[in-house]
Each structure stands twice: as C-alpha cells, then as structure tokens.
C-alpha cells in the first residue's frame, strides 16, 4: 500500500500572501502529473469554525458538500483541483481544543496532566494523517504567519511529522514577501531572512522558498536568499503578481515549482498536461466583449466576502468568452434615486446571500429596479427571499410582506426553518440537498436536468402558504426540495431572465466546469447588452 507524501505550506512576513492559491496550484500541477492528491487547511484561530465570523474579518464562509462551514481557501482547493472538500479538510485551534476538552471530561487521558505537547499536537497530527490512505500527496496549508503565537502548536506538530517521516515523505514550502522600497528603488530580502529564522526557531527548515513580489526578482537576490536561508538556489522560486489567479498553475510550472517538488521526493517527472489551464488563460486574456454585472450587497468594500461568487461569474464569463466587469453597489443606500443611478449601466444585477436587516431595503430597491426595467436578475439565498418579498409587496399587493428574520409582520413570506435554537453556530440548513426542477422553466433550460443537488447555508425558508398567490401572479416556483417542503427556486415568467435560488450555486462552479446558472446568467447579460 502506497504511503502519502506531505507538503506543508507556511507563510511569512505578512498575511494574505496567497498560501491557499499556492496550495491549490501545487495540487493542480501534481494532478496534471497524474498523482492523487488532497488539500487541507489548518487554521490557528480559536473559533470552532468561521460560521459565525464577520465576513469583513474573515471573508466568505465556504460550505462543503457534507455541510461544513470552512475557510474560503477550501473554495480555491475545489476550483483548482475539482476535488470536493469535506469537513475533514479544515481544522481550527477551537475545534482541536473542543475535542481535547471532551476527551478530558470523558477520562480518555486517564488522569494525566493535559498539555499542549503532546495532547494538542497529537490531535493536530491525527487531523493531518486522517483519511490519507491511497493518496500520493497531502498538501497542508497553515493559516496565519510564522511568528504568530497561535501558530506554535501547529508548527510543533509539523516538526514532529517531519522528524517521524523524514525528508523522503515531507517537504516544506515557505511563501514570503520580498517588499519593494520605492525610495531606495530596490527589493529587500531582510524580512524573508527573519521569517526563515523564525521558522528555524520552531525546528523547521524550508525546502522551497516562494518569493512573492510586485517587481522582478533577479538572480543576485535569489542567490542572497539561498545563501542566508540555507536553501539551494534552484529552490528559491519567484512568485510574481499575476492579473488573474488562473494563470498561477502555468506560471509555477514554468518557474519549476512542480519539478523541484518531484526532485525532492526522487520521483519521475512526466511532462504535465496543462492544456486545459492554457485554454482558460487564453479565454481570460482574449475576451470578445465586456458586460457589466452589478453586485448589490452590504459587504461590497470587502470583495473576499463574495469570493466564490466573483469566481463563479468569471467562470460564466470564460464559458461565454467575455469579460465580466463587476460594479459593486452598497445596499445600505436606501434612497431609490441613488440606487437607480448606480444600476443604470448594468447589463445584469445580482443580489447575493447575507444575514441581518442592515441593507435589506436597499437590496429590495435594486430588485425592483431589475424587475421593472427587464434587466437580468439573479438572487441567491437572501437575494431570492428578498426578490419574493419585493414581488409580494408590489405585484401581489401584500404591502406588509417581509421576513420573520427581520420583524413581525402580517405577511411572513419568509419563515424560520423547522426547529431552531438560539445558538447561531451549527444550527442552519447546511450542505448538499436535492431539488426537483420544473420541466418547463428557465432553470430546466440551464441545467438540462429535472433533479439537481446544490449546497445550502440558511436558517430561513420561503413560506409555502403563499405559493399559490405567487404563482397566480406570475412568479413560478421552479425548484422544490426533494421532500417537497422547501421552495428552492423561483423565476418570473414574463421577464427575460429573473431567477432566485435558495441555495449557493457559486460553491460548485469551477473554471473548467462552470456552473450552468452562471453561464446562463452571463449569457443573459450579453443579450441585454
């Protein structure tokens, strides 16, 4: 039975350098070489998961097929490799300590003093090794920055893995920043030297250093890094900025990253097939035209809050051979005129999911603008719920129509799903659910299938008591959950393209397999133009 090899990706100097994209690109390249891989994320924060974290702090919450609320990097892993992530692919310090304390209360430690070493580190190692049978490579990204106090148990666990398995089964990639000082007109390697020494102090020596920089890194600078950080010159690899993330697998292959990884493990190096990635990059660089899609939300100053959504639009654009220009519109704007002015040049309008009543009326104004001006509209999760509320108010004439999530009202179009408790964490309808599609609908035109499976993340559902009134007035309930209890999709029959879905189709879209709804939505934007 083959034994998996482990690739650990750490980051230094600053956060948000793109460790997740490095891990994703390495995974894609190893797949292209014919290897079976899996990518995991180790997050040092104390939350159990990011489910209750503010998107402005953490970015979007990516939902896996099996219902785990995870870090947005798992979305990158799926999009680059096509491998569905699971709840076993994301661990946090909070989850580790939660499990640790449960074991201690059960008496699993037989009266021993419970400590970071070995008990916390053993649980981290258990996560790293779990379910790796039959894999060639397991890629583990460590969140945060080397030197953070929260990262220390994870680095110690990696040190122990490295000690136990040896270099024949472990490689460490360190992503670092080489800042450019405009005043001195030169790149500075000193922060990288200090970052590597911090890593050394944890008992770890990087095998490969990836140098992120906005300027070209020359050989003399690479030689300096190699000499002072004790890494071979061929393993000091530039990681220049790119205009689009899907350029990265081809770029890293050209820089020799996959070659150096395989040489480290003394593996043969058949030439990888990157034709699919070349085609994707070509489509991005050579669009036939540009369309403008307005995204109306309350986190528009923080695009990472809508990471999968933006990527799904890009996938729809790639499929249609166009470029999507995103017009970010803050839904906290409650006046009709300013909203209209901000949307007037839109070829399509999208209202994404969200929580809380802040910005709700602004979204409803945007939905009304799309409906009454025949502009293609896509409502996702809360976006669908608000589209139905807008329709109920202005077409069905239920003036007090609203959602139980926000206030008591005479016509609760949206209600709480089933039995819920007061805790916010882990109480939602999460993960993949099947849905039956109306055969005579735009949904059917997009999917070409009457049964679909999509991922959900919501606590409230559409009140089915209003289904007949909605359909009688022209809003078709075109998607119903498999058990018949939830309205999953609606569409306006008299509109060129007006669809709302309760689920999150963006979580399943990939550059080489774009989601059919986003392909259809971008096509509608092209037709509108």
Swiss-Prot record:
Under the heading CDD domains, the entry gives: CTPS_N (cd03113), GATase1_CTP_Synthase (cd01746)
Q: Where does CTP bind?
A: 15, 148-150, 188-193, 224
Recall the GO molecular function terms of this protein's record: ATP binding; CTP synthase activity; glutaminase activity; identical protein binding; metal ion binding
Residues reported to bind L-glutamine = 354, 382-385, 405, 459
Q: Where does ATP bind?
A: 16-21, 73
- Glutamine amidotransferase type-1 domain: residues covered: 292-529
* Pathway annotation: Pyrimidine metabolism; CTP biosynthesis via de novo pathway; CTP from UDP: step 2/2
Activity modulation notes: Allosterically activated by GTP, when glutamine is the substrate; GTP has no effect on the reaction when ammonia is the substrate. The allosteric effector GTP functions by stabilizing the protein conformation that binds the tetrahedral intermediate(s) formed during glutamine hydrolysis. Inhibited by the product CTP, via allosteric rather than competitive inhibition.
According to the UniProt record, one GO cellular component term is:
cytosol
Q: Name one Pfam family in it.
A: GATase
- Which residues bind Mg(2+) per the record? 73, 141
Under Enzyme Commission nomenclature, its number is: 6.3.4.2
| Key words, A-Z | ATP-binding, Glutamine amidotransferase, Ligase, Magnesium, Metal-binding, Nucleotide-binding, Pyrimidine biosynthesis
Active site, UniProt feature:
381, 504, 506
Q: Which family does it belong to?
A: Belongs to the CTP synthase family.
Q: Sorted alphabetically, which NCBIfam families does this protein's record hold?
A: PRK05380.1, PyrG
Q: What is this protein called?
A: CTP synthase
Q: What is the native source organism of this protein?
A: Wolbachia pipientis wMel
């Amino acid at each position: 039975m083959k034994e998996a090899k482990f690739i650990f990706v750490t980051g230094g100097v600053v956060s948000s350098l793109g460790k997740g994209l490095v891990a994703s690109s390495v995974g894609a390249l190893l797949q292209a070489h014919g290897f079976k891989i899996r990518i995991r994320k180790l997050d040092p924060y104390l939350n159990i998961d990011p489910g209750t974290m503010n998107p402005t702090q953490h970015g979007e919450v990516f939902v896996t097929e099996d219902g785990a609320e995870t870090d947005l990097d798992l979305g990158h892993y799926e999009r680059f490799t096509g491998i569905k992530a699971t709840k076993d692919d994301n661990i946090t310090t909070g989850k580790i300590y939660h499990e640790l304390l449960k074991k201690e209360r059960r008496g699993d430690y037989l009266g021993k003093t419970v400590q970071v070493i070995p008990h916390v580190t053993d649980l981290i190692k258990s996560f790293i090794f779990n379910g790796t049978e039959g894999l060639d490579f397991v890629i583990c990204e460590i969140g945060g920055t080397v030197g953070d106090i929260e990262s220390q148990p994870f680095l110690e666990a990696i040190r122990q893995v490295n000690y136990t398995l040896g270099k024949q089964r472990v490689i460490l990639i360190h992503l670092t920043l080489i800042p450019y000082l405009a005043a001195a007109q030169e790149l500075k390697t000193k922060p990288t030297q200090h970052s590597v020494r911090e890593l050394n102090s944890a008992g770890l020596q990087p095998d490969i250093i990836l140098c992120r920089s906005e300027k070209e890194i020359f050989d003399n600078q690479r030689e300096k890094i190699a000499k002072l950080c004790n890494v071979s010159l061929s393993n000091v690899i530039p990681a220049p900025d790119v205009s689009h993330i899907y350029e990265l697998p081809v770029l890293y292959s050209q820089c020799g990253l996959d070659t150096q990884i395989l040489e480290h493990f003394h593996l043969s190096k058949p030439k990888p097939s990157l034709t699919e990635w070349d085609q994707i990059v070509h489509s991005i660089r050579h669009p036939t035209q540009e369309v403008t899609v307005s995204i109306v939300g309350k986190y528009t100053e923080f695009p990472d809050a809508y990471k999968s959504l933006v990527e799904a639009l890009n996938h729809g654009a790639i499929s249609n051979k166009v470029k999507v220009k995103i017009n970010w519109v803050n839904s906290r704007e409650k006046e009709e005129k300013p909203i209209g002015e901000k949307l007037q040049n839109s070829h399509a309008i999208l209202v994404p999911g969200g929580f809380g009543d802040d910005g709700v009326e602004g979204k409803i104004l945007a939905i009304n603008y799309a409906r009454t001006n025949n502009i293609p509209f896509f409502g996702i999760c809360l976006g669908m719920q608000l589209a139905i509320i807008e329709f109920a108010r202005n077409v069905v004439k239920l003036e007090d129509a609203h959602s139980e999530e926000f206030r008591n009202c005479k016509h609760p179009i949206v209600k709480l799903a089933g039995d819920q408790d007061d805790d916010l964490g882990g109480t939602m309808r999460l993960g993949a659910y099947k849905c039956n599609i109306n055969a005579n609908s735009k949904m059917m035109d997009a999917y070409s299938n009457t049964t679909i499976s999509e991922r959900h993340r919501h606590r409230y559902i559409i009140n089915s008591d209003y289904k007949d009134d909605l359909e009688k007035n022209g809003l078709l309930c075109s998607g119903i959950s498999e058990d018949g209890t939830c309205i999953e999709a609606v569409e306006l029959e008299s509109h060129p393209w007006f669809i709302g879905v309760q689920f999150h189709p963006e979580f399943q879209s990939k550059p080489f397999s774009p989601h059919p709804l986003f392909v259809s939505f971008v096509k509608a934007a092209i037709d509108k133009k």
